[in-house]
Amino acid sequence: MFYLSDLLLHVIGFG
């Protein structure tokens, strides 16, 4: 699921 990976990247970026 590519969209989940993109979402995780955003979360990590904000983290």
Curated annotation (Swiss-Prot):
Keywords: Transcription, Transcription regulation. Induction: Higher expression after 5 minutes at 42 and 45 compared to 30 degrees Celsius; at 10 minutes the protein levels are similar at all temperatures (at protein level). GO terms for molecular function: regulatory RNA binding. Disruption phenotype: Cells no longer have growth defect on galactose (upon overexpression). The keyword Transmembrane does not apply. GO terms for biological process: regulation of carbohydrate utilization. Changing S5A: Increases severity of growth defect on galactose upon overexpression. The keyword Transcription applies. Changing F14A: Partly relieves growth defect on galactose upon overexpression. Interacts with DNA-binding transcriptional dual regulator CRP. Encoded within the Spot 42 sRNA (gene spf, a dual-function sRNA) which acts both as an sRNA and mRNA. Plays a role in carbon catabolite repression (CCR), which prevents expression of genes involved in catabolism of nonpreferred carbon sources when glucose is present. Encoded in dual-function Spot 42 sRNA (spf gene), it inhibits CRP-mediated gene activation when cells are grown in glucose, especially at higher than 30 degrees Celsius (when Spot 42 sRNA base pairing may be less efficient). Overexpression of this protein leads to decreased cell growth on non-glucose carbon sources, with particularly poor growth on galactose. This is Small protein SpfP. It comes from Escherichia coli (strain K12).
